[in-house]
C-alpha cells in the first residue's frame, strides 16, 4: 500500500529536512484540499504528523485532524507527541483510525504495553526512526531524532510483538526528506526477520524506481511525503507503478 503523508504546523503543510524545525519548507496548499486530491487518485490511507503536537501536546491541531479524518475520503493514521492515554484517546475521538507512537514506545514501555492490551494491534503503529551505526545495527532515536537511544530496532520490536504489535513505520533518518533513494536493504532485512509485521517504509523515496525496489523486497507499504509535494511523481503514477511492480 502507498500512504501519502502530510506534516502539519499551524494548520499548514510543511516538510522538515531530517526532522529539523529550522530547515522547514512550507507548501502553498491546504491540508484538506491536498488530502482530497490524494483520495481522488486512489489512496486509501493518509499519514498525518502533527508537528505542533510533537513539540507541545497542548498545541495539538485537534480540529484539523478531525476535519481530515472526516472529510479527506481516506482512513487516517496520525502521530506527533502522543505521550499519555488522554493524548491517545483524543486522537481516536477525532476519528483517527490508528495512532502513530514513536518516542513513547521507546521511553515508556509499560504505558505502551497497556495501550496494546486496551486497544489492540490494529489501532497502533509503532514509528521507529533509526540511525544505522558503523556495525550495521539499526539504532532507534527519539524525540524528533534529537536524542539517540541505546536500543536497537529489534529490542523495541521484541517488547511489543507478543502483545499484538502488527504495524511498524520505520524511517532511516539519514534518508528522510533528502530524496536520495531509500534504504532498501533495511526493509529487506527486517521483513525477512519479522514477516508477521506490516512494514511501512519511510524516507528518501525520490522516483518510481524506488517504489519498485521496495516492492521487490516485499515491503508492505511506503509513506510518500516530499516526493509527492515536490512533483517528483503523482499519486496516480505511484499507485500504477506499485500495482504493476
Curated annotation (Swiss-Prot):
Enzyme class: isomerase
InterPro entries recorded: Aldolase_TIM (IPR013785), His_biosynth (IPR006062), HisA_bact_arch (IPR006063), Isoase_HisA-like (IPR044524), Isoase_HisA-like_bact (IPR023016), RibuloseP-bd_barrel (IPR011060)
Catalytic activity line of the entry: 1-(5-phospho-beta-D-ribosyl)-5-[(5-phospho-beta-D-ribosylamino)methylideneamino]imidazole-4-carboxamide = 5-[(5-phospho-1-deoxy-D-ribulos-1-ylimino)methylamino]-1-(5-phospho-beta-D-ribosyl)imidazole-4-carboxamide
Pathway info: Amino-acid biosynthesis; L-histidine biosynthesis; L-histidine from 5-phospho-alpha-D-ribose 1-diphosphate: step 4/9
Catalytic activity, EC: 5.3.1.16
Subcellular localization(s) per the UniProt record: Cytoplasm
Stretch forming the signal peptide: none
HAMAP family reported in the protein's UniProt record: HisA
Protein name per its UniProtKB record: 1-(5-phosphoribosyl)-5-[(5-phosphoribosylamino)methylideneamino] imidazole-4-carboxamide isomerase
Amino acid at each position: 500500500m502507498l500512504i501519502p503523508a502530510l506534516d502539519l504546523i499551524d494548520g499548514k503543510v510543511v516538510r522538515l529536512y531530517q526532522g529539523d524545525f529550522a530547515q522547514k519548507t512550507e507548501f502553498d496548499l491546504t491540508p484538506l484540499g491536498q488530502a482530497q486530491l490524494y483520495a481522488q487518485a486512489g489512496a486509501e490511507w493518509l499519514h498525518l504528523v502533527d508537528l505542533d503536537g510533537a513539540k507541545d501536546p497542548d498545541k495539538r491541531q485537534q480540529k484539523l485532524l478531525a476535519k481530515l479524518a472526516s472529510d479527506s475520503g481516506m482512513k487516517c493514521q496520525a502521530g506527533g507527541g502522543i505521550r499519555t492515554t488522554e493524548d491517545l484517546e483524543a486522537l481516536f475521538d477525532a476519528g483517527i483510525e490508528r495512532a502513530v507512537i514513536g518516542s513513547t514506545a521507546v521511553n515508556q514501555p509499560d504505558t505502551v504495553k497497556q495501550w496494546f492490551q486496551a486497544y489492540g494491534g490494529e489501532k497502533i503503529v509503532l514509528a521507529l526512526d533509526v540511525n544505522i551505526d558503523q556495525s550495521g545495527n539499526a539504532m532507534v532515536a527519539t524525540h524528533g531524532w534529537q536524542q539517540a537511544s541505546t536500543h536497537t530496532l529489534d529490542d523495541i520490536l521484541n517488547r511489543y510483538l507478543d502483545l499484538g504489535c502488527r504495524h511498524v513505520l520505520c524511517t532511516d533518518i539519514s534518508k528522510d526528506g533528502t530524496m536520495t533513494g531509500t534504504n532498501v536493504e533495511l526493509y529487506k532485512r527486517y521483513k525477512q526477520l519479522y514477516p508477521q509485521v506490516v512494514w511501512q517504509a519511510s524516507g528518501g523515496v525520490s522516483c518510481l524506481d524506488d517504489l519498485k525496489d521496495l516492492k521487490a523486497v516485499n515491503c508492505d507499504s511506503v509513506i510518500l511525503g516530499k516526493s509527492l509535494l515536490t512533483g517528483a511523481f503523482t499519486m496516480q503514477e505511484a499507485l500504477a507503478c506499485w500495482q504493476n511492480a
